[in-house]
Swiss-Prot record:
Tissues where the protein occurs: Plasma; synthesized in the liver.
Organism, as annotated: Tamias sibiricus
GO cellular component: collagen trimer; extracellular region
Protein's UniProt name: Hibernation-associated plasma protein HP-27
Lineage of the organism: Eukaryota, Metazoa, Chordata, Craniata, Vertebrata
Keywords: Collagen, Glycoprotein, Hibernation, Secreted, Signal
InterPro entries: C1q_dom, Collagen, Collagen/C1q_domain, Tumour_necrosis_fac-like_dom
Presence of the UniProt keyword Secreted in the record: yes
Stretches assigned to the Collagen-like domain: 43-81
Stretches the record annotates as Disordered: 34-79
UniProt main location, coarse: secreted
Length: 215
């Protein structure tokens, strides 16, 4: 009997709490309907969803600033060594105040105006080619009261001949030739008059030559 009374008392208390909770819920719902904004209050953050598919690539951005210069690289390998052929040079200019007393003899020049390479032999009056190539030779002779006749010779062959006679005054002759010479070819100026024609008057001669370009 005591247990039945205790159970009835417990059921009565539980009923009271259920009734109070129902009233409270009714009040809350009534307030919510009167103030709809209260329903917009966000709830707690849910768990992350699944990753979506990749998007389309974006447009390239503007160029960035230039970076700092890098460190010097290691030395490269040595280059190839090539032996360069130096350009040949040859030039002379010589002067004489007389012609040889016998014909068909080279004119002996006593003074070298220029012969830095030493290719002209003053003792023989002969130029010996040291560098194969194209050369220019020229001569100028002034004669006073005498006849002059000379030839430009190459290896014993006449290239050109000039002559003049100044019996009572002054005469001038000159000549220029372009010659292709090989190594050791010889060029000189040769007298073509006899001793009788050379006995009177005076003469002054200048003979020159230079390399235009080598072969």
């Amino acid at each position: 009997m005591y247990e039945a009374g205790k159970r009835a008392s417990f059921m009565g208390g539980a009923g009271i709490w259920i009734l109070a909770l129902s009233v409270l819920m009714h009040v809350v719902c009534s307030e919510t309907q009167g103030n709809p904004e209260s329903c917009n209050v966000p709830g707690p953050q849910g768990p992350p969803g699944m990753r979506g598919p990749p998007g389309t690539p974006g447009k390239p951005g503007p160029p960035g600033w230039n970076g700092f210069p890098g460190l010097p690289g290691p030395p490269g390998p040595p280059g190839m060594t090539v032996n360069c052929h130096s350009k040949g040079t040859s030039a002379f200019a010589v002067k004489a105040n007389e012609l040889p007393p016998a014909p068909s003899q080279p004119v002996i020049f006593k003074e070298a105006l220029h012969d830095a390479q030493g290719h002209f032999d003053l003792a023989t009056g002969v130029f010996t080619c040291p560098v194969p190539g194209l050369y220019q030779f020229g001569f100028h002779i002034e004669a006073v009261q005498r006849a002059v006749k000379v030839s430009l010779m190459r290896n014993g062959t006449q290239v050109m001949e000039r002559e003049a006679e100044a019996q009572d005054g002054y005469e001038h002759i000159s000549g220029t030739a372009i010659l292709q010479l090989g190594m050791e070819d010889r060029v000189w100026l040769e007298n073509k008059l006899s001793q009788t024609d050379l006995e009177r008057g005076t003469v002054q001669a200048v003979f020159s030559g230079f390399l235009i370009h080598e072969n």
